[in-house]
């Protein structure tokens, strides 16, 4: 989906850090400002594979695979984006089985607020249960995307606008409820009390907004989700597995 910069900034709702424009304010545009990984798991568990290794990145993403892999793939994605769901369905199984499990490729998913408060609510939910749950919850949310996004489409515009005008400590809980995400999370082991905490966690909210700013600054040619970066370089004009695979194969062979 195309970047809607105004909508992404709208999620800031005055109490959040404002979105920057796409002009980098320091350093060289296109050079990632923070690609470090907080390594809590360096090796596969006994009997497991590199796909069982998940670490958090300093840039606000989650990395599956060998943190020291030769090829580092970054997906800039949105949980509400249908093109991102298509990549999840068509590309991710092969990406994991044929690339990540070899230890030669790591895959970072970095959530991007392409649909403002909608993505914020979804992102906070999938982050809520820690590292090990992130990728399974993200996949499950993609699987059910038509259901929860359908609730948004069916909602009265006045109700959606009212939610977006609430303070952040109320807006994302209300948006999650509108989308049915708290019930969805409860069915997957995240009780409402815990999801309430995540949806009102200012530190997590600030981090989500910072991701938008950093992506816009670090990758000025990024135009929409999904976007892909291989070893720090944005892959131009690629938003599907069919286009990404040749670029990934070339990087592995280098």
Where in this protein do the model-derived segments appear?
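Extracytoplasmic thiol/disulfide redox context detector
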Residues: 2-9, 14-119, 212, 216, ...
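C-terminal cap of thioredoxin/glutaredoxin-like
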Residues: 3-6, 20-37, 78, 171-254
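A short hydrophobic/aromatic micro-motif that marks alpha-helical segments and, especially, helix-coil
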Residues: 17, 145-148, 204-207
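Secondary-structure junction/capping motif
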Residues: 49, 166-167, 224-225
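Surface-exposed, interaction-prone regions with an acidic/low-complexity signature
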Residues: 62-66, 141, 145-147, 235-237
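Extracytoplasmic/periplasmic, Sec-exported soluble proteins
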Residues: 65-68, 83-88, 113-117, 126-129, ...
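Structural alpha/beta surface segment adjacent to cysteine/selenocysteine redox centers
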Residues: 85-172, 220-221
